[in-house]
Amino acid sequence: MNQKIAAYGSWQSPITAATLAQAGRRFVSLQCSGDAVYWVELRPLEGGRYVIVRRAPDGTTTDVTPKGYNARTLVHEYGGGMAAFDEGTVYFSNFTDQALYRQDGAETPARITPTPLTPLAQRYADGRITPDGKSLVYVREIHLDDGTVINEIVVLPADGSSEPAVIASGYDFYSNPRISPDGKWLAWLCWNHPMMPWDGTELWVAPLETDSSLGSARRTAGGPQESIFQPEWSPENILHFVSDRSNWWNLYREIEGEIEVLAPMAAEFGEPQWVFGKSRYTFLRSGHIACIYKQGGFDYLGVIEPGKASVTSIPCAFTSMSSLSTDGTALWLIGASPTQGPTVLRINPTDGRIQEIQRAAEIDVNPLYISTPEAIEFPTEHDKTAHAFYYAPTNPDYAAPDDELPPLLVITHGGPTSATGAQLSLTTQYWTSRGFGV
């Protein structure tokens, strides 16, 4: 191909402002339940409504959330964990009133939490259903008229026949109430202001009594200097969790009061918990633990075999992954790559075969115009090392003069933990295809 010689920054590109403005859905979260897979979509063309979608075993997809409902919670303001699933029954928080609703199949959702005197004063998130299907355990956030905000864990009947009862309180923040498969134990995370969950959290465990009250609770892990992420119970009722006690978020488990690391490595199995419902590991029927871990800014997929202290990687072209779940044998997740936007994926953990189920948007851009990231690092103040992705100018139609360097756009993240991900950004490609480095 004959390339035109033109200055960096002056190249013509097929990626236009109109390309960037194309409205596409966004996948918020995903979870397997029974023989179905559910995910939540944010739909800009429906006014930013959050819609729960169900994929049946035969591959058909159905919108679960009816028009007029919006499956979104405002607990901790950032939300997440807006839905819980029990076979064909869905429980979700509704954005307009922040109440909890129960929806059986295609029936109209029924409100199961009381109406507060002040609108939006009671909010619910991150719920789980007891194994017998009779009770729900949720994080509840109450906003008082004087501005005081109270977080607590509550239990309520699945049919909403009585009001929620508080079973854990006293800390400023709660998350991740998780019920053991045998229904006998409850684990949860909590922390106090001014700590953030990536600074220090506490993991607590208590017996879950037959009347849904809690027995004597004990702190299992965590504290002001230890961040705990995603506590989960294995099918054998063994508590697992991610901890940064080694300065890396690694996976641990507790057996008979002893805590042991499963696969120590210089990688992050956790991430900052801005929202509820994050999932970066799950349990397969084979006894393996499937996991997502981050190294050098890229996400990788792997499995930990029973009795082994290492992770076996699963080859995967997707480098940004979230919401890892399983139907028992296959892995389900939301994945993206430098050349492809978010996609619902089904992955065979044995041979790594990937099936694309649903793309967030169909992007009609020739891959030759796509710049892929190079992980770089450089020294910064206080003898620290900064990390970044570099996207080089990329356009098959142009080349720059040999003695010229490209203009560089430097995009810094906002907030204390925000970071770029290794996934397609048309905004980045808009500039790189015109001869800018980013």
Functional labels for PLM-detected ranges:
Residues 2-7, 278-362:
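N-terminal targeting or regulatory segments adjacent to alpha/beta-hydrolase or S9 domains
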Residues 5-55, 72-82:
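Beta-strand-rich domains and repeat architectures in extracellular enzymes and scaffolds
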Residues 14-21, 62-73, 110-118, 163-168, ...:
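A short beta-strand motif characteristic of beta-propeller blades
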Residues 23-35, 70-90, 119-135, 170-186, ...:
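Conserved beta-propeller blade repeats
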Residues 37, 50-52, 83, 98-102, ...:
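Hydrophobic beta-strand positions in blades of beta-propellers and related beta-sheet-rich domains
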Residues 41-51, 71-77, 92-100, 116-124, ...:
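A flexible loop/linker signature enriched in serine peptidases of the S9 family
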Residues 56-59, 104-108, 157-160, 208-211, ...:
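Short loop/turn segments that connect beta-strands within beta-propeller blades
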Residues 232, 236, 322-438:
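Serine-hydrolase catalytic core recognition
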